[in-house]
């Protein structure tokens, strides 16, 4: 009887870990998880406005990626570089110098910053935690994010 309970408990632990229930959330197929959020790199280049619209169409609550710590930015760099090599991805910031209270396109507060210049829209390098200002009409790759 004791062995049956032990085996049953072991199977339950395995099932919970495979289902994502142990972590409390599970991202859709093709999306990567970090700190209760889901992320996906898209190998398509588009301007900032089209990229933000594209992200909102990928999943409910999805927007261009926002960063709230250097660890989160490192996670995205580690996710994007193998796919895109040395390049830029749009992040969810635009027109930040025209606003008193800057926020990400997903509505969250701008509480982590890593600027490298000044312009209308912001792109992040795929090889380091560094943000670059770019004309919003330029085309770059897309990383979308939503809360799981």
Curated annotation (Swiss-Prot):
Gene3D superfamilies registered for this protein in UniProt: Mannose-Binding Protein A, subunit A
Residues glycosylated per entry: 47, 78
Subunit structure: Heteromultimer; disulfide-linked.
GO cellular component, one term: extracellular region
Database matches in SMART domains: CLECT (SM00034)
Record-linked SUPFAM superfamilies: C-type lectin-like (SSF56436)
Leader sequence segment: 1-23
Chain ranges of the C-type lectin domain: 34-145
Described purpose of this protein according to its UniProt entry: Interferes with one step of hemostasis (modulation of platelet aggregation, or coagulation cascade, for example).
Protein name according to UniProt: Snaclec stejaggregin-A subunit beta-2
InterPro entries given in the database record: C-type_lectin-like, C-type_lectin-like/link_sf, C-type_lectin/snaclec_domain, CTDL_fold
Pfam families given in the database record: Lectin_C
Keywords: Disulfide bond, Glycoprotein, Hemostasis impairing toxin, Secreted, Signal, Toxin
Domain of life: Eukaryota
Keyword Glycoprotein: yes
GO molecular function, one term: toxin activity
Lineage of source species: Eukaryota, Metazoa, Chordata, Craniata, Vertebrata
Tissue-level expression: Expressed by the venom gland.
Family: Belongs to the snaclec family.
Broad class of the protein's primary localization: secreted
Compartment list: Secreted
Disulfide bond annotation, renumbered to this chain: 27-38, 55-144, 121-136
């Amino acid at each position: 009887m004791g062995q049956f309970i032990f085996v049953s408990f072991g199977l339950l632990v395995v099932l919970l870990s495979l289902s994502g229930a142990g972590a409390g959330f599970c991202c859709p197929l093709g999306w990567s998880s970090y700190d209760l959020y889901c992320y996906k790199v898209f190998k398509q280049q588009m301007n900032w406005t089209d990229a933000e619209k594209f992200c909102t169409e990928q999943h409910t609550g999805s927007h261009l990626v926002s960063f709230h710590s250097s660890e989160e930015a490192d996670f995205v760099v580690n996710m994007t570089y193998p796919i895109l090599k040395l390049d830029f991805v749009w992040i969810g910031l635009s027109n930040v110098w025209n606003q008193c209270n800057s926020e990400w396109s997903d509505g969250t507060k701008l509480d982590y910053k890593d600027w490298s210049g000044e312009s209308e829209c912001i792109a992040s390098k795929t090889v380091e935690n560094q943000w670059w200002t770019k004309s919003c009409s330029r085309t770059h790759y897309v990383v979308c994010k939503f809360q799981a």
